[in-house]
Amino acid sequence: MSTMNKEKLKGLQSFLKDDIWRVTEDEVSKSRGIFYNAIKIATLSIREFTQGRIINKASALTYSTLLSSIPILAILFAIARGFGFSNLLETQFRSGLEGQSAAAETVLGLIDSYLIHAKSGIFIGIGLIMLFWTILSLTYNIERTFNYIWQVKKPRTLYRKMTDYFSILLLLPLLIVLSSGISIFMTTMLKNMEDFVLLAPLMKFMVRLIPFILTWGMFTGLYVFMPNTKVKIKYAIIPGIIAGTAFQAFQYLYIGSQIWVSRYNAIYGSFAAIPMFLLWTQISWSICLYGAELCYVAQNLKNYSFSKETRSEEHTSEL
C-alpha cells in the first residue's frame, strides 16, 4: 500500500473516530448532515447494543418465549376458531415451519391438548389463570427490556397491561388472516394475468413484497407501542424496515437450510425442533432489540452532546 493511501486511510479513521462527532448540522449541507447522522446512529446503536449486553436480554426473552409459546398460540387459535378462520391460521403456521413438518404437527397437537385441558372439568379455572399469567409474564419481560433500552424506569400499570396486550392478541389473528388473504388474492390475480407480459413481473414483485411490508409494519408498531414512553413514529420507520428486512432474510435462510436441519435431526432425533426453535428465537429477538436500539438512538441523537475539545460525549435521554 502506498504512503498516500495509508495517509488517506489514517485520515478516514481519524475522521470517523473523532472529527465526525464534532460536526454540527449547521456546518455541513443537509444531505451530508443526514449521511453523518446515519454513521453516528449506526455507531452509537452498535455500542449501546454491545455495552448494554442486549444479547443477554435476547437470551432471557428466548427463555420466556419458549415457556409462553404454546399458551400464546393456543389463545391465537382459540380466537381464530371463534371467528371461523382457524384453517387459514393453521396454514400460515405450517408455512412458517416449512421443512419441519414433524415439529409443526407436534406443536399443533400440543395446542389442541392445551385448549382441551384449559376448558375441561375442574381445571378450567386453573388452566385459564395459568394461561393468562404466562402471557402477561412474557409481555412484561418484553416491555421491561424495551424500557431498559429506552431508560424508562416506570412500567405500565396492570390495567394498561391487561387492556393493551390482550387487544394485540385479539388483533394478531385478524392481521395474520388478512395477510394470508392478500397473498392468496395477489397470487390468484397473478395466475390470471400471466398473458399480460408487462404487468406480470410487477405483480410477482408485489406478491413477494407483501411479507416484507407486513413485517416492516409489525416491527415499526412494536417500537412505537412497546416502550412505556412516547416514541415518534418517524424515528421508528427506518429501524422497523431494517429489522424487518433482516428478519425476513433470516427467515429465508432458516427455511432454506435443509442440510443444516437434517444434521440436527440426525443428532437430536425427534427433539431436533427444540434447539432449532431456540436458535431461531434467539436470533429473532437479537434482530428485534437491535432495531429498538436504532430507534432509541435516532430519537435521542440530538441529546448526545459531543465536545469539540475532547473525544468524550455526554448523553441525556429524551423521554
Identify the role of each PLM range:
Residues 2-317:
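Membrane-embedded alpha-helices and immediately adjacent juxtamembrane helical segments
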